[in-house]
Amino acid sequence: MAHMKHPGARPDTYCNHTNHADDRRRNIIMPMLDMPLYELRQYQGRNPRPADIDAFWDAAVAEMEALGTSCDLMKADFQVPHSTCYDLFYTGAKGARIHAKLVVPDADKSLPAVVNFHGYTGRAPDFVDLLKWTAAGFVIAALDCRGQAGESEDVGGVKGNTHQGHIIRGLAENDPEKLLFRDIFLDAAQLARIVMALPQVDETKVGAFGGSQGGALTLACAALTPKLNRCAPTYPFLCDYQRVWEMDLAKDAYQELRDYFRRYDPLHAHEKEIFTLLGYIDNQHIAHRIQAKTLMFTGLMDNICPPSSQFATYNKITSEKDVVIYPDFGHEYLPFAAEKAMQFMLEMANA
């Protein structure tokens, strides 16, 4: 008689659905927030795609690459044995001074590296929370998003950080160059290039990971950094804005979309133009640029970044990819996901 694992046992591998058999035959009994899983796997998104989006991002990447990979490293006050902690500063899009945390293990050879992106309104994790990666043999850098809770500079004409309202910032200008997330996407990709250029790093073994806004920036980083090796987003934000709106989920992290319409377009006279402009910072429309091997984590009960919005992006990724499905989980802690993500990166490191 075959022995079943205890229901709470840790999965053996990072992937729970490698062969993608017909999901209609999977015996998962659960409430339904969004589409059935087999429909999610075919869903292609609702948000309009700007006609010139590829040219737009080609020009933006060229602008970023002209800034180079130079950075200033300052030893942090927090230090531990066997690794060195740094505050890393560089000049990002539109001249902003961008900050990241960097931890480098003591080693006499080049190392794999990961870049981490935090959730909306937050900041890079404390140095102590990054040490699990250095213990596993990785260099790790963690971005402070401009305008949020960290040390990066926001050059948007305001004193201090604004924390929220970043999706809609620039919409009133009717110019995608003015969208704040255009610059944050570039900051993320530039940090990956800076890490690749560090003498301690093997540039062929660099990955990115993060959850929510961090998942969105992981995808954007991969889309704008062709040399990135691995991409591990967890329930990514900033995908398929129109679908979020149509599901009446423009609340919580997406609340500013509702606020914008109520204040500036209460009759939705410019609805198409607004969603098309948001299309420039919609990950589904740049996902085809991703070359990194990708592992996404999705909770099917996510009512903040709904599964269909995530799959709108996932389904457009053409590189090798997989998704780990959590049927009963939403926008929250996903058991074993962090371990699976590290295992995914260790496979890169050991290749």
Residue ranges and their predicted role:
Residues 16-83:
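N-terminal targeting or regulatory segments adjacent to alpha/beta-hydrolase or S9 domains
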Residues 100, 110-119:
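Short beta-strand element of the alpha/beta-hydrolase
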Residues 125, 131-132, 138-186, 243:
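Cap/lid segment of the alpha/beta-hydrolase catalytic domain
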Residues 167-212:
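Gly/Ser-rich "nucleophile elbow"/oxyanion-hole loop immediately N-terminal to the catalytic nucleophile
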Residues 219-268, 325:
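Hydrolase active-site cap/lid region
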Residues 290, 296-298:
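Short beta-strand/loop motif that positions the catalytic acidic residue
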Residues 326-333:
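Histidine-bearing beta->alpha loop at or near hydrolase active sites
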Residues 336-351:
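Catalytic active-site module of serine/aspartate enzymes centered on a nucleophile-bearing elbow/loop
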